[in-house]
Design a protein with these regions (language model features):
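Generic beta-sheet signal
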Residues: 53, 76, 114, 146, ...
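Positively charged, low-complexity intrinsically disordered leader regions
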Residues: 1-24
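Buried hydrophobic packing segments
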Residues: 6-13, 39, 91, 156, ...
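Active-site-proximal loop->helix
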Residues: 26, 35-97, 179-192, 216-218
Length: 252
């Protein structure tokens, strides 16, 4: 799914002339790795350079893969999204402050902005959702997804609800995330946000990049179509990953 999102973001930027291939232009993004890997892959294929800003506790395997794909990887301390030094805000700042050199006067800098761009939602509404519906021959009772940016859950849920109102879209929410309460009760909040209990890692889970404590544009677009949410513990997630590996051959 991240390949779809990355391609949609880059394609729309090219249509809007925010990016021009083979001009020395740079793509900047703040990510825990997955979207960055897709952006770095496509940057190589389409003639761009790529700078990915990650939290410094991201899995080393992701950072290594990003570097091998040619991306410049910058690691920053994990901070809250309101902090200008949060990895997403750092990526935006780097894009805004970047200047072309005299040898590449047509080069540009583009901030992918995966959390807020409509291209994320559109990729899943226009592609992932229809692919699921087609490949299952319309036999979909429920769709369950976590929320990183909210794009997958929102885009797919919107499409499936459109073709079959009886489909049940469900958010799977990890410890520390506020999505469960937002969907069930209309309030984006988790008990770990109470005064005196806040932590360095607000979404406290072994599942990197999943969970939100703010309403992103991509999650907001899908809220009318998401029917329910379920809390999933780390133990449940790890046990299911082992089950899928053993029984379905899926390495997650």
């Amino acid at each position: 799914p991240k390949d779809r999102v990355a391609l949609q973001i880059i394609t729309e930027a090219e249509k809007d002339e925010l990016l021009v291939p083979h001009t020395g232009s740079w793509i900047f993004e703040g990510t825990v790795g997955s979207t960055g890997i897709s952006l770095a892959t496509l940057a190589c294929a389409k003639g761009y350079r790529c700078c990915i800003v990650v939290p410094d506790d991201v899995a080393e395997e992701k950072a290594t893969l990003l570097r091998r794909l040619g991306a410049v990887v910058e690691a920053v301390r994990p901070r809250g999204i309101v902090d200008p030094r949060h990895f997403v805000n750092e990526a935006r700042t780097r894009a805004q402050s970047w200047k072309p050199n005299r040898h590449e006067p047509c080069a540009r800098a583009f901030f992918a902005d995966q959390f807020e761009t409509d291209a994320n939602f559109s990729a899943h509404y226009e592609h992932t959702g229809p692919e699921i519906w087609t490949q299952t021959q319309g036999h979909v009772d429920a769709f369950v997804a976590g929320t990183g940016t909210g794009g997958t859950l929102s885009g797919v849920s919107s499409y499936l609800k459109e073709v079959s109102p009886s489909v049940l879209p469900v958010a799977a929410d990890p410890p520390g995330s506020g999505v469960y309460n937002r969907i069930q009760y209309g309030l984006m909040y988790n008990a770990t946000e109470a005064e005196g209990t806040r932590r360095r890692h607000q979404v406290d889970t072994v599942v990197e990049g999943i969970g939100l404590n703010r309403l992103t544009r991509n999650l907001e677009l899908g809220l009318p179509f998401i029917d329910a949410a379920e809390r999933v513990t780390d133990d449940e997630a790890v046990r299911m990953s082992r089950w899928l590996s053993t029984h379905d051959g899926l390495f997650l």
